[in-house]
Curated annotation (Swiss-Prot):
Lineage: Viruses, Varidnaviria, Bamfordvirae, Nucleocytoviricota, Megaviricetes
Protein name: Uncharacterized protein L136
Taxonomic superkingdom: Viruses
A Gene Ontology BP annotation from the UniProt entry: polysaccharide biosynthetic process
InterPro entries per UniProt: DegT/StrS_aminotransferase, PyrdxlP-dep_Trfase, PyrdxlP-dep_Trfase_major
GO molecular function: pyridoxal phosphate binding; transaminase activity
Ranges in a coiled coil: none
Length: 352
């Protein structure tokens, strides 16, 4: 199978038999949404299989963006004020929208994470660091900084669900992290998201998934403008859970193998995106940096560029964006295709 058959997402077919078994619990209770019976099953599976620590709550949401916004809204409600966050320019727009619309955008450093030198002279309450496409920053640099400066630390792990740092899943670090289970992500099916957060904030976040309404208060419950309908429905949960049950180990192993091939056979003039995991990361795409800017239409196979900087005046973010090449990484990718990609990129390097 050649590069003309290359796909960004693996062929994800529903296991209808397994989905039907899962949905039977919904049929028995006639509850398919509003936190029905499959939600807790999915949260338990994520905790156990993604090795999430007991000090963290696992809370599924409708998608990765709603996970980030529900997380921030819940913390705002808990602390009784709207917090000011700093986010990096090299990331997805979610961290500058909704409850984060007033976040401060700063550049990244040469390691691919938020530049801590850029926050020295500004007032803020917390930082959001994005781990890019499965690669992780030097996490302890941010943990130590936020601890020393009494700041909240959130990791946007939308595409980094199973990369380890110093022996534990990177999702366990900071006060919280979020994961995306969007269909384009390695572990996703359809659409979904997940918050992994210190248990201190769990109750306010769960209430925030339901417009801020605390059902235990009955008629006394009041909605919150720091909340919304962020809940995942049980039908989505069933498809995600079924896909994970059947494939998560295969995804972890194959994505590690793919990364290993690129690591040992880097195309000329390309280098891997910065990564601080000792073991191979589980990447959502293989991110390579060329030694000079190039146009994506010069690459003769399916590939992309992420992320267009939120602030185009951020020099390091813009440099990364102009030089990055994001290559498909999924369980359907064959070794033959990988080596063909490497060969094509070597030719590209010779001609450019």
């Amino acid at each position: 199978m050649g590069l003309e058959k290359l796909t960004w997402v693996s062929e994800k077919k529903p296991d209808w038999s397994n989905v039907q078994k899962l949905i039977a619990a919904c049929e028995a209770t006639n509850q398919y949404t509003n936190i029905g019976p499959i939600i807790s099953q999915l949260e338990s599976f994520i905790r156990d299989s993604f090795l999430i620590e007991e000090s963290k709550a696992v809370i599924v949401t409708s998608n990765g963006t709603s996970a980030l916004h529900a997380l921030v809204g819940g913390i705002n409600r808990q602390l009784g004020r709207e917090l000011k966050f700093v986010t990096q320019s090299f990331t997805f727009p979610s961290s500058n929208q909704g409850p984060l619309k007033d976040s401060i955008i700063v550049d990244i450093d040469e390691d691919g994470g938020l530049d801590l030198n850029a926050v020295k002279n500004i007032e803020y309450d917390g930082i959001i660091v994005t781990n890019i496409h499965g690669n992780v920053v030097d996490i302890n640099k941010y943990v130590d900084f936020c601890m020393n400066h009494n700041k909240l630390l959130i990791f946007d792990n939308a595409a980094t669900g199973y990369t380890f740092y110093l022996g534990k899943n990177s999702c366990n670090y900071g006060h919280a992290s979020i994961i995306s289970f969007h269909h384009t992500k390695p572990f996703g099916f359809g659409e979904g998201g997940c918050i992994i957060v210190d248990r201190l904030y769990e109750n306010n976040i769960r209430i925030g998934l339901n417009f801020g309404l605390d059902n235990s208060l009955g008629e006394k419950s009041q909605y919150s403008n720091q909340a919304s309908n962020y809940r995942m429905c049980d039908l989505n949960a069933a498809f995600i859970l079924s896909y994970l049950q059947n494939n998560y180990k295969k995804i972890i192993n194959r994505h590690s193998e793919i990364y290993e091939i690129y690591k040992n056979n880097l195309p000329k003039r390309f280098k891997l995106f910065p990564n601080h995991s000792k073991k191979n990361p589980v990447c959502s795409s293989i991110c390579l940096l060329f030694d000079k800017p190039f146009r994506l239409d010069k690459i003769p196979f399916l590939s992309r560029k992420y992320y267009k900087p939120l602030d185009l005046s951020s020099p390091v973010s813009l440099d990364f964006y102009q030089r990055i090449l994001c290559i498909p990484c999924n369980i359907d990718l064959t070794d033959r295709q990988i080596y063909e990609i490497i060969g094509v990129l070597n030719e590209f390097a010779d001609k450019n």
